[in-house]
Structures are given as C-alpha cells and as structure tokens.
Curated annotation (Swiss-Prot):
<keyword id="KW-0963">Cytoplasm</keyword>
<comment type="function">
    <text>Subunit of both mTORC1 and mTORC2, which regulates cell growth and survival in response to nutrient and hormonal signals. mTORC1 is activated in response to growth factors or amino acids. In response to nutrients, mTORC1 is recruited to the lysosome membrane and promotes protein, lipid and nucleotide synthesis by phosphorylating several substrates, such as ribosomal protein S6 kinase (RPS6KB1 and RPS6KB2) and EIF4EBP1 (4E-BP1).</text>
</comment>
<dbReference type="GO" id="GO:1905857">
    <property type="term" value="P:positive regulation of pentose-phosphate shunt"/>
</dbReference>
<dbReference type="InterPro" id="IPR037588">
    <property type="entry name" value="MLST8"/>
</dbReference>
<feature type="cross-link" description="Glycyl lysine isopeptide (Lys-Gly) (interchain with G-Cter in SUMO3); alternate">
    <location>
        <position position="305"/>
    </location>
</feature>
<dbReference type="GO" id="GO:0006974">
    <property type="term" value="P:DNA damage response"/>
</dbReference>
<dbReference type="GO" id="GO:0045821">
    <property type="term" value="P:positive regulation of glycolytic process"/>
</dbReference>
<feature type="repeat" description="WD 2">
    <location>
        <begin position="40"/>
        <end position="80"/>
    </location>
</feature>
<dbReference type="GO" id="GO:0071456">
    <property type="term" value="P:cellular response to hypoxia"/>
</dbReference>
<keyword id="KW-1017">Isopeptide bond</keyword>
<feature type="repeat" description="WD 6">
    <location>
        <begin position="218"/>
        <end position="257"/>
    </location>
</feature>
<comment type="similarity">
    <text>Belongs to the WD repeat LST8 family.</text>
</comment>
<dbReference type="GO" id="GO:0071470">
    <property type="term" value="P:cellular response to osmotic stress"/>
</dbReference>
<dbReference type="GO" id="GO:0031932">
    <property type="term" value="C:TORC2 complex"/>
</dbReference>
<feature type="repeat" description="WD 5">
    <location>
        <begin position="168"/>
        <end position="207"/>
    </location>
</feature>
<keyword id="KW-0472">Membrane</keyword>
<dbReference type="GO" id="GO:0030307">
    <property type="term" value="P:positive regulation of cell growth"/>
</dbReference>
C-alpha cells in the first residue's frame, strides 16, 4: 500500500471526527492537533468508517456516501455513492474490503460492491421503519439491522433469510454491536435501556441464535450508541444524558462513568454524548459530543487525556483506528 509521508494514512493512528458543521477533521490523537480538514459539501455527516486497509474513509450523509482518500491530501471525495432517498445513518465494511454496507431512513439496508466499477448498490434489505444502525457479525455473513419501530433484524447474507426480535416495542433501536469474540450482542434504545444477548451458532451454515442475557437500565435518557472493546471485556454506552458508561462484560456491572456534565450549577447542558470508539488495546476511548468536542479518556480512571477542539457544531460521529497493519 502506497502512503504519502505526511498524510493521514501514513500515521499509525487515524482519528477522524465529523458532524453538523459539514466537515471531517483528522487529528493527531496524542497531541490534539488537527492535521487535515475536509469539507463535506451539502450535508451533515451521520457516520464515519475507515476501510480495513486504511486507505479511505467513508462519510455517510444525506442521500450519499462519500469516500475520501487517506493517502493523499486530495480535498475532494474520490468516490461518491448516491441513489439513496434519505439520510444514511450507518456505514461499515466487510473485513476484506470487498463490500460496504449502509442503512438509513429510507427503511433499507444496502450492500455495495467496492470492487465493481458500477456504483449502484447490489443488494437491498427492506424493513418497515427507518433504520438507525447496521452492524456486521464477525463471521462476515450476517448483518444486524436496528430500526425505529424497535425491531432488530438479523439478515443472513448467504441465504437471504432474516429473523426479527423486538426487545422493547415502540422504543427505537439506536445502536447494536457484536463483540469481536462473537460471544455477545448488545443493543441500546431510545428509552435508555441496553439489552445484551449471548450468541451461539453463526459458524458454517448455522445461523446465529440469540439467548437473552441481561437488560441494563443504562441511561435515564435516549441512548445513542453501544460499542464493545476490542478485547471483548468492556461495553460502552453513550447517551443524551451527557455520559458514556463503561460496563464490564464479566457481569455487566458499571466500571466507569465518563461525564461531560458541568460542575457549575448555573451552566446548561453541554449536550449529548453521540458516539465512542475504543483504542486497539481497550485502555482508552474517544467520545464525540454535541458541545463541538471529541475527547480521549482513560477507560480505567475516567480521566480526560486529550480534547479535540475545532468543530463549529455538534460532533456526532467518529472513526478511530490505531491498529498497525502487518
């Protein structure tokens, strides 16, 4: 892979943030310095994801996904995927980078072949409500789709079969994630609850079976994202209550609460904690929030190690990759 010295792709740590100010910003994670800003025209950015080979970043917005080059300083998207009628809320990649998946307010999850010169989507999974989140099972063969009616759909890409479960009717599923070991799936909803399932199957032709494990009353307000740590020992949940909470997967007890609440009684809310991403060693976490900042925290102590300031509006999504490719 050719990386130009001084580009984002040449840095072993890639940290990108985006949101409502129509920019994607790239940061030196250790120093807090913004190294590159890309103008994302026409739309806010709802989701960011770095390709597995670290060559590009996908920014999902209103009616399109734009791919920006990490190995040059080209300010323009090198590929644009269009043809979606509403906001795209979620984006991710197959581990080999062969295809991309998205989900959005047009009630569809889509698969896009990244090797094809044709920029149309190849497969569509239609549901009956706007989609908030899509995540890929580590087996690379099942997509988990969460929608605003409260349903979670498990779309088997090999057979096109799908299963559905509704943990809490009428509470919108805002985020779902499966840990890297494929032991657990978590989902959070608009009521602030986090549901966890044990996973079995999902190998060969066996479809994944979900066995309810626990319900965590994680937040008093809207929950926005859940993410397992790379070592599968932690689960983070982010919320409109201005906190990101970190739970131990050994017993799903609370380990650390990261809060952006002001200690000054007169100060109004600093806004929602929109999203998070763990470092590769699971010892740090980066959060995105609507006070225009991203922050790097120590997971164990809850201490803020770095703040990333420069966005003019809410930061609602981020992408973090500090894995060095062999």
């Amino acid at each position: 892979m050719n990386t130009t010295p001084g580009t984002v792709g040449s840095d072993p740590v890639i940290l990108a943030t985006a949101g409502y100010d129509h920019t994607v910003r790239f940061w030196q994670a250790h120093s807090g310095i913004c190294t590159r800003t890309v103008q994302h025209q026409d739309s806010q950015v709802n989701a960011l994801e770095i390709t597995p080979d670290r060559s590009m970043i996908a920014a999902a917005g209103y009616q399109h996904i734009r791919m920006y080059d990490l190995n040059s300083n080209n300010p323009n998207p090198i590929i644009s995927y269009d043809g979606v009628s509403k906001n795209i809320a979620s984006v991710g990649f197959h581990e080999d980078g062969r295809w991309m998946y998205t989900g959005g307010e047009d009630c569809t999850a889509r698969i896009w072949d990244l090797r094809s010169r044709n920029l149309q989507c190849q497969r569509i999974f239609q549901v009956n409500a706007p989609i908030n989140c899509v995540c890929l099972h580590p087996n690379q063969a099942e997509l988990i789709v969460g929608d605003q009616s409260g349903a979670i759909h498990i779309w088997d890409l090999k057979t096109d079969h799908n299963e559905q479960l509704i943990p809490e009717p009428e509470s919108s599923i805002t985020s779902a994630h499966i840990d890297p070991d494929a032991s657990y799936m978590a989902a959070v909803n608009s009521a602030g609850n986090c549901y966890v399932w044990n996973l079995t199957g999902g190998i060969g032709d066996d479809v994944t079976q979900l066995i309810p494990k626990t319900k965590i009353p994680a937040h008093t307000r809207y929950a926005l994202q859940c993410r397992f740590s790379p070592d599968s020992t932690l689960l983070a949940t982010c919320s409109a209550d201005q906190t990101c909470k970190i739970w131990r997967t050994s017993n799903f007890s609370l380990m650390t609460e990261l809060s952006i609440k002001s200690s000054n009684p007169g100060e109004s809310s600093r806004g929602w904690m929109w999203g998070c991403a763990f470092s590769g060693d699971s010892q740090y976490i980066v959060t995105a929030s609507s006070d225009n900042l991203a922050r790097l925290w120590c997971v164990e102590t809850g201490e803020i190690k770095r703040e990333y300031g420069g966005h003019q509006k809410a930061v609602v999504c981020l992408a973090f990759n500090d894995s060095v490719l062999g």
